């Protein structure tokens, strides 16, 4: 191949000009390929009769001939210019590939004919896809077997075309530093019919074509009439318009992903930022993975000058779509990227500029290392652990970092090995798996913050069907980092009754760790009954004061979809019943269901946009003092599912009444957003089952109805069961809370 390449380089250096005879195609012979459109122009005169070929009137350089020989002769008469650029290794049938090696006798007059390399003495033919050194000229039947076995059988099929394997030196020859041209060595390879890329392995070529199909790039360059791009759809959410590409709900088929199911996530983050904007202004905000830019557009459109929004994305198509969406919402775009793109923002007459948005195109880790922000939101595809270190590197003091994790298969214990790989955590499927997932993410966030000498305060954590959202406030200093690191502990989980308790602090090895569990399953069941999960976040997951300010902002901006969820989070953080069974709550009062809602005027008194260094220091100290007060009232960890612990043959009480029964027994109790039938309480599992059994009624079948139950017999049965449960608890030495 090197000798052949050197022979081809000699006429390039001398730049010879030769006259190329262009034969007139006949019905019994193959057409001679036409020159490429981007090669030297060849003007052919009026064709003569078929017996005498007409030479071209314009001189053609020798390098242009080599480029013209790589074109398909079967498409020389095609009207489309893009169709003639297809490589000769891409054909429809095997016969078309064989025609490339066939040349009529009249074409052999000139030594510099287009297919002179394909002929040899004795009417032998050479392979059009192999150099002379690899496959010498041979007879037609032998060439047929060679093309069929070596090129056609290992081809890749796509839309009726076959991308055959090619052995020619197809890489362009580039001069080195001295100026000498050195031929590039390339083995067997394929040419992509869509993007003309060169792929070495067949499996890689299949994956390459599959990626084109997933992105909708099936309209390749050989199609004569290229179809117009499908129109973009405009969606509206929270008074913000966004253009979305086709297949916007499938990440594999679009460059700009938009998930309508994440609406609750976007509204929660908006209320978080709105509550933070009441403390200090202006805020440097970052949406590290913009996609369509819907989240950053909502920030800038509804919060105005209180925020300075930066939307980042590494995909060039997404950056272009973000800029278009900014203009659609009358927002000025400030472009900042490594490629130094410059685009003028032109507004139509009568339009008003609502604000500025900075759009960047770079890696999220690089951007967070270069600039400091007050608010950072991370929403990557899958896990977010790869971006936590850079997020806490330059975050300002008392700033907020929100993390959305969509790798629910690993967090919800469906792929336990992936959770161990990403989070360094050992988990199993439990009844409280959603809260377990939230504590796993918080533990990863806490470790990343501690590595940067920063601590965290968890404002709230939400785990729903499609995502896990964790929002934390950053506290600078090694003292805060040490306090945060102490809250990461292991969890002891009983596999029989699913009782759980955090392991005690200490470096000493305990002889019998089963003693820490309130249950007596280890003594009554054979073998090892408990496992160790974690490390997990063991402290509170909610900040009541911040959640109340979020509820106020949701009322102020009219976000009705998340008000019920925020109220549930508030009651869950306080661990108090949301309602009274006999007295209905009045939702018209400022105090809704036991939650006092601050107005906008009240929240301004807590603002931290103070003037002067001394005043700002005082407000910061007050803020930290208020945060410590909120953290002290921690809610009980984890919850119990009332259906999971129901008694066979008994009808459970209503969930509302059961919460009151637990509260009357002296336990803290509330519902949880993690599970619609879950109960968060500080009661141990044995007491939980005892109260559930006490107020359950027997199930009757047959002609009797459930309402005909004698109260005396019911109390007697419940008392007996409770006494037996208490006797077992006292015999096992269990601690009753």
Curated annotation (Swiss-Prot):
Zn(2+) binds at residues 494, 497, 519, 521. Coiled coil: none annotated. Keywords: Isopeptide bond, Metal-binding, Methyltransferase, Nucleus, Phosphoprotein, RNA-binding, S-adenosyl-L-methionine, Transferase, tRNA processing, tRNA-binding, Ubl conjugation, Zinc, Zinc-finger. GO terms for cellular component: nucleolus; nucleus. It comes from the Eukaryota. Residues 17-49 have a biased composition (Low complexity). Its EC number is 2.1.1.-. The modification Phosphoserine is found at residues 72, 616. Specifically dimethylates a single guanine residue at position 27 of tRNA(Tyr) using S-adenosyl-L-methionine as donor of the methyl groups. Dimethylation at position 27 of tRNA(Tyr) is required for efficient translation of tyrosine codons. Also required to maintain 3-(3-amino-3-carboxypropyl)uridine (acp3U) in the D-loop of several cytoplasmic tRNAs. A motif (Nucleolar localization signal) lies at residues 141-145. PROSITE patterns: SAM_MT_TRM1 (PS51626), ZINC_FINGER_C2H2_1 (PS00028), ZINC_FINGER_C2H2_2 (PS50157). This is tRNA (guanine(27)-N(2))-dimethyltransferase. Pfam families: TRM. There is a cross-link at residue 589 (Glycyl lysine isopeptide (Lys-Gly) (interchain with G-Cter in SUMO2)). The keyword Transmembrane helix does not apply. A zinc finger (C2H2-type) spans 190-212. S-adenosyl-L-methionine binds at residues 266, 313, 363-364. Residues 1-65 are annotated as: Disordered. GO terms for biological process: tRNA N2-guanine methylation. It is an enzyme of class 2 (transferase). Residues 50-62 have a biased composition (Pro residues). One of its GO terms (molecular function) is zinc ion binding. Gene3D superfamilies: N2,N2-dimethylguanosine tRNA methyltransferase, C-terminal domain, Vaccinia Virus protein VP39. It catalyses: guanosine(27) in tRNA(Tyr) + 2 S-adenosyl-L-methionine = N(2)-dimethylguanosine(27) in tRNA(Tyr) + 2 S-adenosyl-L-homocysteine + 2 H(+). Residues 1-10 have a biased composition (Acidic residues). Residues 233-692 form the Trm1 methyltransferase domain.
